[in-house]
Amino acid sequence: MPKIPAGMRKKPGGGYEYRFTVRGRRYSVYGKSVRECTEKAERRRREIEAGINRAGKALTLDEYFLRWESARTGSVRDSTLRTERYIYRIAADVEADGAPRLGALSLDEISRQHLVLVQTGLRRAYSISTINRCMSVIKAILESALEERLILWNPSKGLRMLKDTKKPPRETIHRALTPEETQAFFYAAEQRGSWYLPLYRFLLNTGCRFGEAGALLPGDISEDSICIRRTLTKSLDGKLIIGSDAKTGHSARMIPARRAALAAVREQRDKNTRCFGDEEDKPIFRAPRGGLLGARCVKKDIDQLCEAAGIERFSAHAFRDTFATRAVESGMQAKTLQEILGHADIGITMNLYAHVMESTKRRQMDAVEVLPGAALSII
């Protein structure tokens, strides 16, 4: 009787089972004898190896991306899928050192060196954060291909992300405005007759995200609340569209309507009627020619108004930060603010509290009188 090799066992009911591993994945074959079981295992090993090689050569990265995306549909948000498509296309269209574009390469042709060259190529036109997002998506796709045994290894494993030496947005143009800056900015906007003035007033009085405001329809506004259902996003080809849902599940929310916010809505709707007619199915806040709000055009307008007002420039997100800052300073509860802002995690809101309190800590510390009437120094 042949000796039973390691990995094989005799089954209680008769016959043999042979367990073996190929590249981290376990397989089993069964036979009536040791010899039959051994032969089946060898044949199965060859089939597995051949299958891996054939699959890796047959599928291009573009083809596998469609398969990967299809498998994720329904388990992740539509807005996430749209963003991943857009980011993937940026990376997939790169041609490094005369080689075919990344998306046209078969899975087994993609090497670590090729991905490094793609990183380098992207630096000519994109920010560090965008490049890192591109490489994160490529890494996730290749990791999925590895799990399906379509490639023998993930060439992006260990690939270092680029270091972003820029200051965090909150330390530059992503900030809250002081009361003096707010007053100067809106005075300049009124004097120059900015088309976007109602939008700025609305953002400041609701804490909405720019994309959420740009996707609001007349039916989303009532006398006592504002319903956030969707946001502006980009399609696969980079075209600006209104998404079918909000940024996240927590982003879909009802905001109590302040009088100033409702006044801004009425002002914008009056302008829309004069310029475009009465269109109930179109967004409230639009571009001067009636299209969807473009971030670049709004940024340009804000920059011009900041220059006219003599204040440091900021982004449209600063209106949201300003609303949140004033809310914290007014004593609004963290949970309430989380719901109004649509933060997915209370930790995000608490970080905002910490940031606001850092700026007011010295003023409040100076106001504390530990020993009434005591000298400044008791040592």
Residues covered by each model-derived region:
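N-terminal core-binding DNA-recognition domain of tyrosine site-specific recombinases/integrases
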Residues: 26-34, 70-155, 171, 291-297, ...
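Catalytic-site neighborhood detector that most strongly recognizes the C-terminal catalytic loop/helix
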Residues: 231-234, 341-366
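N-terminal DNA-binding module of tyrosine recombinases/phage integrases
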Residues: 9-17, 21-113, 270-280, 358
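C-terminal catalytic core of Y-nucleophile DNA break-rejoin enzymes
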Residues: 34, 171, 225, 243-267, ...
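Basic, Lys/Arg- and aromatic-enriched nucleic-acid-binding interface segment
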Residues: 128, 132, 136, 147, ...
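Conserved tyrosine-mediated DNA breakage-rejoining catalytic core shared by Y-recombinases
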Residues: 158-164, 215-270
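C-terminal secondary-structure termini that scaffold catalytic or DNA-interacting sites
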Residues: 1, 234-236, 241-252, 259-261, ...
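Short, basic (Lys/Arg/His-rich) helix/loop patches that form interaction surfaces
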Residues: 97, 187-197, 206, 255, ...
